[in-house]
Amino acid sequence: MSFKDLRSFISHLEECGELKRVSYPVDPYLEMTEIADRVLRAGGPALLFEQPKGHSMPVLANLFGTPKRVAMALGKEDPLALRDVGELLAFLKEPEPPRGFKDAIAKIPMFKQALNMPPKTVSRAPCQEVVMTGDDVDLTKLPIQHCWPGDVAPLVTWGLTITKGPRQKRQNLGIYRQQLLGKNKLIMRWLSHRGGALDFRDFQEKHPGENYPVVVALGSDPVTILGAVTPVPDSMSEYAFAGLLRGERTEVVKALSCDLEVPATSEIILEGYIAPGEMAEEGPYGDHTGYYNETDSFPVFTVTHISHRKDAIYHSTYTGRPPDEPAMLGVALNEVFVPILRKQYPEIVDFYLPPEGCSYRMAVISIRKQYPGHAKRVMMGAWSFLRQFMYTKFIVVVDEDVNCRDWQDVIWAITTRMDPTRDTVMIDNTPIDYLDFASPVAGLGSKMGLDATNKWEGETNREWGTPIVMDEAVKRRVDDIWDELGIEQSPTL
């Protein structure tokens, strides 16, 4: 099932018991966060706060609060089915040449589908049903969530920031948090390596002294939202990728104030510009690490136009110590990454980003080891292959007999198959998440790789241990007589 807009997805979730309407008045200042956090930690539904205090616009929270709902947003019922999305991305990133005539014929539909999904431009769109300009622009009328007691101001969290640079043929979609600064001002917190920041830098070089047009879309259809956080090939737009997943071209409409194209069915659109040199101190804010981050200076986004649908819905989230919504997204998108990594490194059996590792700061990889030093090659490959893993601080590599998603198994492998000196890889002065205050320099720190695989000749001079395994016939015999033993419960094996 595909969803043309956020409202159709909300209706589907409600029918499936995956969304709860909250009619009791709830304050966007702290209360929504506490409620959403309790519900998410219990594996509960998405929440639609129908009466946010002080505002007439309802607030949608916890939309992607479980891996199941992430899968549902992409038209799947099971998170494991998201590997199909990963297979598609792996193909788009590196299409295999046909192995023969029959294979070429078989691949035609996939190539044709990929080429036929550019966005569809429409002249009128729901996101422009209500338009405000000039003095009518007032961001404080939006029920922007103030998430934590130490946050400096309300924070826009789920906005799709749309930019275009002079070096790119396509638009870029990115999700960057935005601090409310005034009735028509937001702080655009994009890190220097992110697409929006790179577009802005290129624009400044080519058009010095000119305002840079920017648009932010809130409440877009779920596939377009998730397209902005998946590893889409650089040559493909997020709109085209969303169309591929949806099986229908993404409808876009020209912005009111510039040539950027925005998702036509979005709930709210903020249009404006970033003036050269206009910066402001951003933060502190509670973040996905579970800590308040440092303050720093970022560009100011001046909003000149606000447009929205009639009876618009404001889409929001919070970030905090895992589990939070970004962590749940990470668990689901983990399945997307597996086929992409396997395409480049077929020896990879499984890949896991534990949510308690703040989505991406730790990875565990199981491999079919083929030669001495193999684990180190896989570490280096994972760190460098996808931009999403450039901030991964710790990588543990285990053999295929170890379940990389089971900490008991992983810790057993680390403590029995590793020598701390021989099997630990340390790399200094690498890119690190700006929010990682544990690094000695902002944005620059070290990485650690742990080779927890069985060691081969050349890696050790010792006779290697043989794992203890019970005889299968004995296990079957005990299974057969278990009920006769009078033992109430069989341990999980």
Swiss-Prot record:
GO terms for biological process: ubiquinone biosynthetic process. It comes from Shewanella amazonensis (strain ATCC BAA-1098 / SB2B). It catalyses: a 4-hydroxy-3-(all-trans-polyprenyl)benzoate + H(+) = a 2-(all-trans-polyprenyl)phenol + CO2. Binds 1 prenylated FMN per subunit. Keywords: Cell membrane, Decarboxylase, Flavoprotein, FMN, Lyase, Manganese, Membrane, Metal-binding, Ubiquinone biosynthesis. This is 3-octaprenyl-4-hydroxybenzoate carboxy-lyase. Belongs to the UbiD family. One of its GO terms (molecular function) is metal ion binding. InterPro entries: UbiD (IPR002830), UbiD-like_C (IPR049381), UbiD-like_N (IPR049383), UbiD_bacteria (IPR023677), UbiD_Rift_dom (IPR048304). GO terms for cellular component: cytosol; plasma membrane. Prenylated FMN binds at I175, Y176, R177, R189, W190, L191, R194, G195. Catalyzes the decarboxylation of 3-octaprenyl-4-hydroxy benzoate to 2-octaprenylphenol, an intermediate step in ubiquinone biosynthesis. It is found in: Cell membrane.
